[in-house]
Amino acid sequence: NTLLVCAAVIRFRHLRSKVTNFFVISLAVSDLLVAVLVMPWKAVAEIAGFWPFGSFCNIWVAFDIMCSTASILNLCVISVDRYWAISSPFRYERKMTPKAAFILIGVAWTLSVLISFIPVQLSWHKAKPTSPPDGNATSLDETVDNCDSSLSRTYSISSSLVNFYNPVAIMXVTYTRIHR
């Protein structure tokens, strides 16, 4: 379905001329990236019973967070776009230019990359390893065949606020105002 959405917008000129469809394409791309960069790797690991991709784990975790964040932020941008289009249609036509749309899309994707890759590459996202009962300091998290994506409490809370709760609150407000 995602590919069909992209193909339709690319194929039909009247769909390309609507700024709103830029946001739809951005959402479709984020969903497509989940299907390409996240799901296959996890499926192979689940089938194999271990993580066969070694140090690719951190990059995979960053892609997972990035794609999920991009999807949510794109949904948020779409809700704001629809609110502006409905609440101020004449101003919307003047202000929501392709340039403005690309800026909003760029902000959503930039935030997604920053929120995912920086914390993951700096290991801010990881829960502190716990020592096993035998007192050995190594953790399962450190083994090559385990891609443990357990999150630290601080990262989990801050990431949830920025990546999920704030965008959902914005969407709830915009759609509530639209339906009034």
Curated annotation (Swiss-Prot):
GO terms for molecular function: dopamine neurotransmitter receptor activity, coupled via Gs; G protein-coupled receptor activity. Disulfide bonds join 57-147. Residues 49-57, 125-153 are extracellular. One of its GO terms (cellular component) is dendritic spine. Keywords: Cell membrane, Cell projection, Disulfide bond, Endoplasmic reticulum, G-protein coupled receptor, Glycoprotein, Lipoprotein, Membrane, Palmitate, Receptor, Transducer, Transmembrane, Transmembrane helix. Interacts with DNAJC14 via its C-terminus. Interacts with DRD2. Interacts with DORIP1. This is D(1A) dopamine receptor. It comes from Oryctolagus cuniculus. The gene is DRD1.
